[in-house]
């Protein structure tokens, strides 16, 4: 994901991201607003003793002030606010200083059980909306989504991406939401990243259409993402369902 100018982020997104990362932020005249909001969506990776961030398919950022043990040394998607430094690296495109970083719920897709009825029983069929936003994107072998649903704050919700729903098109998937009986009291946004690497067929360098379907508050919808498999790398092990925040969603 290219670096983002936070001034161009919509107010709703800014409020969401502020709530995720700065739950108790002093509101004074000394606030450095350039550091309050995220300026990039990245994949957190490690290589030996180094922690680096994958900004897009071709750009890597060496985070010198992060240890490779961050997030238990697992690969996750994350929102980050960083500053460039004057240092150079032969291995990475840029050397950066991370001002703050916050992981996104990161998980693998789940397989279809063969029918809509069985998928609904297992993965749920509650309403969910995908929000058009700068963090809703397919890149680095991940599908990252900002989504919106009704919450009651009493039960854990489950969000899953179901693969294998169309035997004729392996790049067709479904987003499933299980509210787990939680009362529908208010709308709330959340973020999730699905690791498609090794789950859907390798596109072998080509860009294909990844179609996602879901049951929205206005009926069934679908949208296409441009998807290209990650370039071959030695990737750390994925941590299923890891998230620092959002303990009421899995």
Put a short name on every predicted segment.
Residues 2, 35-250:
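First exposed extracellular module after export/assembly in secreted or surface-exposed proteins
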Residues 2-11:
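Bacterial N-terminal signal peptides that target proteins for export
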Residues 11-19:
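Hydrophobic helical h-region of N-terminal Sec-dependent signal peptides
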Residues 20-24:
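C-terminal motif of bacterial Sec signal peptides marking the signal peptidase cleavage site
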Residues 26-29:
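Bacterial signal peptide processing site
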């Amino acid at each position: 994901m290219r670096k983002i100018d936070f001034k161009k982020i919509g107010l709703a997104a800014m409020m969401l991201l502020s709530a995720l990362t700065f739950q108790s932020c002093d509101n004074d005249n000394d606030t450095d607003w350039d550091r309050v909001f995220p300026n990039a969506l990245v994949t957190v990776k490690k290589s030996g003793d180094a922690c680096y961030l994958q900004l897009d398919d071709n750009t890597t950022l060496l985070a010198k002030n992060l240890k490779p043990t961050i997030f238990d040394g697992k690969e996750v998607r994350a929102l980050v606010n960083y500053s460039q430094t004057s240092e150079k690296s032969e291995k990475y495109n840029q050397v950066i200083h991370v001002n703050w970083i916050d992981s996104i719920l990161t998980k693998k897709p789940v397989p279809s059980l063969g029918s809509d009825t069985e998928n609904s029983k297992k993965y749920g069929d509650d309403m969910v909306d995908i929000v058009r936003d700068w963090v809703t994107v397919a890149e680095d072998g991940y599908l990252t989504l900002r989504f919106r649903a009704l919450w009651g704050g009493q039960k854990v919700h489950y969000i899953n991406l179901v693969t294998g729903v169309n035997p004729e098109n392996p790049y067709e998937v479904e987003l499933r939401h299980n509210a787990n009986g939680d009362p529908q009291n208010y709308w709330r946004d959340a973020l999730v990243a699905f690791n498609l690497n090794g789950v859907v067929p390798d596109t072998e360098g080509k860009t294909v259409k990844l179609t996602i379907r879901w049951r929205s508050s206005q009926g069934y919808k679908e949208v296409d993402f441009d998807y290209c498999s990650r370039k071959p790398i030695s990737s750390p092990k994925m941590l299923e369902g890891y998230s620092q925040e959002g303990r009421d969603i899995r």
